[in-house]
Amino acid sequence: MHVVRLSIHRLRRFQTVELHPSSALNLLTGDNGAGKTSVLEALHLMAYGRSFRGRVRDGLIQQGANDLEVFVEWKEGGGAAVERTRRAGLRHSGQEWTGRLDGEDVAQLGSLCAALAVVTFEPGSHVLISGGGEPRRRFLDWGLFHVEPDFLTLWRRYARALKQRNALLKQGAQPRMLDAWDNELAESGETLTSRRMRYLERLQDRLVPVADAIAPALGLSALTFAPGWKRHEVSLADALLLARERDRQNGYTSQGPHRADWMPSFHALPGKDALSRGQAKLTALACLLAQAEDFAFERGEWPVIALDDLGSELDRHHQGRVLQRLASAPAQVLITATETPPGLADAAALLQQFHVEHGQIARQATVN
């Protein structure tokens, strides 16, 4: 899939601006604070329902405005499938939102998020590796959400059961009142965990060659999954029963896939905690690119790939390796930088360049 039009209204520095990117490599340059990242934020907002830099109400809406609007038009399919044009719009006030997809109102943000797939690498992406388990769970679930049509229903089923069980625990409910929600949590949780495990195994097969291509010095060798309870010893139903009294005392559910995690392993490093910030960024980028490749294999088309501030996040050597990997794939890529990154200098003829300044985006002539 590739975006053919991105229209942004009242978002940070932009009053009204439109971008018509190419279907391949795109570079947006401009001074710090010019609004380059805001372009990717708008795209990310449509694909995830949130910005990668915080909540909508935390500064994303232009000062003095009541809401923001983002409109995206993109092509999907092609090849063996019939290409079609899709359109989505989102208006967000920070508290309330309205959305449309292909001319119809949508009742849930998930409908918009399921339609447009964007893989984003930005300065905070290192937390995928160096942070807590929540971003790693979201990473797994994003991949499943986009390649398994019924995954969102399963995830919501588990989340609802977890919410109800936790509410009863906080109320100090009697054990018999927990039985029904324990059964629901165990049934949906076992299925959710099996899906995550299969996905991570498949992703590992894609990740190792990607990491070897863009950062061979990392020596990334495997991904290890922790399901959130001692699954090799007991079922989730038994784990919930065994932990019931402790959970009642603490007021929350301590066992289950909401506590799951996964970790990368390396040939020459003891684990992710031994990584430098730069190594964590490279590992995160390798994971994201592997996820994009898996999406492409399963769906028959690539997601849009957004790389924010590439020049300051990766050195020239790694920029070149990443670009080489992306150039071999029919993916639309949007890159931001204050100036053309050294790793992209030799690929100027392949780039569609844009300059962002004073709240406007100007298309620049392609270098031949």
Swiss-Prot record:
The keyword DNA damage applies. One of its GO terms (cellular component) is cytoplasm. Pfam families: SMC_N. GO terms for biological process: DNA replication; DNA synthesis involved in DNA repair; double-strand break repair; SOS response. It comes from the Bacteria. Keywords: ATP-binding, Cytoplasm, DNA damage, DNA repair, DNA replication, DNA-binding, Nucleotide-binding, SOS response. It is found in: Cytoplasm. GO terms for molecular function: ATP binding; single-stranded DNA binding. The keyword Signal does not apply. PROSITE patterns: RECF_1, RECF_2. Gene3D superfamilies: P-loop containing nucleotide triphosphate hydrolases, RecF/RecN/SMC, N-terminal domain. ATP binds at residues 30-37. HAMAP family: RecF. The RecF protein is involved in DNA metabolism; it is required for DNA replication and normal SOS inducibility. RecF binds preferentially to single-stranded, linear DNA. It also seems to bind ATP. Belongs to the RecF family. This is DNA replication and repair protein RecF. It comes from Xanthomonas axonopodis pv. citri (strain 306).
